[in-house]
Regions:
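Basic- and aromatic-lined ligand-binding clefts that recognize polyanionic substrates
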Residues: 4-32
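Histidine-acidic metal/acid-base catalytic patches
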Residues: 21-35, 39, 45-159
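Electropositive, glycine- and tryptophan-enriched low-complexity nucleic-acid-binding patches
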Residues: 1
């Protein structure tokens, strides 16, 4: 991979082999630093991953960040009814960042104060039958612009 300028990274997911906080931490502990992490805020939150702990301990391994939010009421239904991942997505588990229950301060702090140079991918896994995709994309873009402009301003103030 090095020869081609590529880096291997693991993308954790709900209802997959590495899901919960202790599983993600064990995976990262048992693999070398040559294996990066695609940190997904929605999957992390829904699986009980502590974003502050993961970014503090393994921030140097984060190569890519996916930003999406979680609807608390749907997460509760998913857990109560033991819904599959596909059923959870169809039920509207994920939403545009800033419209759910995730506290993004550990991620915005990590991005502002670390040397992270990777991509931020804003996701809005919406059912297009329930919401016009362009409306979700517009809200997601505004959220990212507002959130990370504030994060950048905080970094400049601290220096």
């Amino acid at each position: 991979l090095d020869r081609f300028g590529l880096k291997l990274a693991y993308h954790h997911h709900l209802m997959m082999l590495v899901e919960q906080h202790h599983e993600l931490e064990e995976f990262l502990t048992k693999t070398s630093d040559s294996v990066g992490l695609v940190l997904d805020s929605g999957h992390a939150f829904a699986a009980g991953v502590d974003l502050a702990q993961i970014t503090e301990k393994f921030g140097h391994r984060i190569v890519h960040i996916h930003l999406k939010d979680v609807r608390a009421d749907v997460l509760h239904r998913v857990r109560e009814n033991n819904l599959s991942f596909n059923d959870a997505v169809r039920a509207g588990l994920f939403t545009v960042p800033g419209e759910g229950c995730i506290d993004y301060s550990p991620l915005t702090g990590f991005i502002a104060y670390s040397d992270y140079q990777g991509w931020l991918i804003v996701e809005a896994e919406q059912d297009p039958q329930k919401e016009e995709p362009s409306a979700a994309v517009s809200r997601a873009f505004r959220w990212a612009k507002d959130t990370f402009s504030q994060s950048h301003s905080a970094e400049e103030t601290a220096q």
